[in-house]
Amino acid sequence: MRLIFMGSPDFSVPVLEALHAHHEVVCVYCQPPRPAGRGKKDRPTPVQTRAEELGLPVRHPTSLRTPEAQAEFAALGAEAAVVVAYGLILPQPILDAPERGCLNIHASLLPRWRGAAPIHRAILAGDEETGICIMQMEAGLDTGPVLMCEKTHIGPEETVQDLHDRLSDMGARLILGALGALDDLVPCPQPDAGVTYAEKIAKAEAGIDWTRPATEIDRQIRGLSPFPGAWTLLNGERVKLLRCRLAEGHGAPGAVLGGLTIACGTGAVEITLAQREGKRPMEPEEFLRGFPLPEGSRAHTS
């Protein structure tokens, strides 16, 4: 099938690779290069980098609302566009241009977690399952009818990074199935009940309040890893907590009970991956060799 691909971050790359292997990708649309790193040099998106490696033409317009951009898009003569974490709203002339419209790969069980950060929000909310929906796009935010859906369990120690990688691969597999069966798929309108929105993650959500229950802090750590990274102060230094598990233990909120097990409002969490500022992430044994925490030390955020 003759396709346009639209995506930008790492999550989109396996989908691009799958489409390139099985279909004709006539053009790749992604976000433009932006300043990044210490030198603030323009850095292309992961999708642009991979597309160029594959020898695919790349476009990164800052808007798709101009008549010129819309004419260029339509002139590609694509049968369909596949959209996954692109980063721009598609106006109606873009949605209407491909013969079979635009298909979106969304990382949630719609209508739950429409919006920008469905993987983070599913873990933060304590959801036991999530999945991938292939959706026929329309003008609303993730409101289109669902063509195909697959569920997956969220593991008790899974982080955003873990789930991100699994769902990315699932999306690549599912879109191939959807494209192959497109003539037979029946669009299923999303129900009005159960709609929730996955707002972008704010850095202000990352500071840990140790008076909260261990179950909530566990979700916060896993649901913000690796970015922006839940953090606390230990011995006056900000430390990111990137992996954890629920643990036995009781004590004053924030008290270090031994190793990297920290008491919460109720229960405790055992930190299994932590990162000091300017250092790489470390498991507890290595972390504590260079940063000893005597029993009775306190974690806090202010």
From Swiss-Prot:
Record function comment: Attaches a formyl group to the free amino group of methionyl-tRNA(fMet). The formyl group appears to play a dual role in the initiator identity of N-formylmethionyl-tRNA by promoting its recognition by IF2 and preventing the misappropriation of this tRNA by the elongation apparatus.
Taxonomy, superkingdom: Bacteria
Protein biosynthesis in keyword set: yes
SUPFAM superfamilies: FMT C-terminal domain-like (SSF50486), Formyltransferase (SSF53328)
Family note: Belongs to the Fmt family.
Principal EC category: transferase
UniProt-annotated binding residues for (6S)-5,6,7,8-tetrahydrofolate: 108-111
Cross-referenced NCBIfam families: fmt
EC number: 2.1.2.9
Gene Ontology MF, one: methionyl-tRNA formyltransferase activity
Catalytic activity: L-methionyl-tRNA(fMet) + (6R)-10-formyltetrahydrofolate = N-formyl-L-methionyl-tRNA(fMet) + (6S)-5,6,7,8-tetrahydrofolate + H(+)
Gene Ontology cellular-component terms listed: cytosol
TM stretches of this protein: none
Biased composition, class Basic and acidic residues, residue ranges: 279-288
Gene transcribed to yield this protein: fmt
InterPro entries for this protein: Fmt, Formyl_trans_C, Formyl_transf_N, Formyl_transf_N_sf, Formyl_transferase-like_C_sf, GART_AS, Met-tRNA-FMT_C, Met-tRNA-FMT_N
Region (Disordered) residue spans: 279-302
Pfam families: Formyl_trans_C, Formyl_trans_N
Name under which the protein is recorded: Methionyl-tRNA formyltransferase
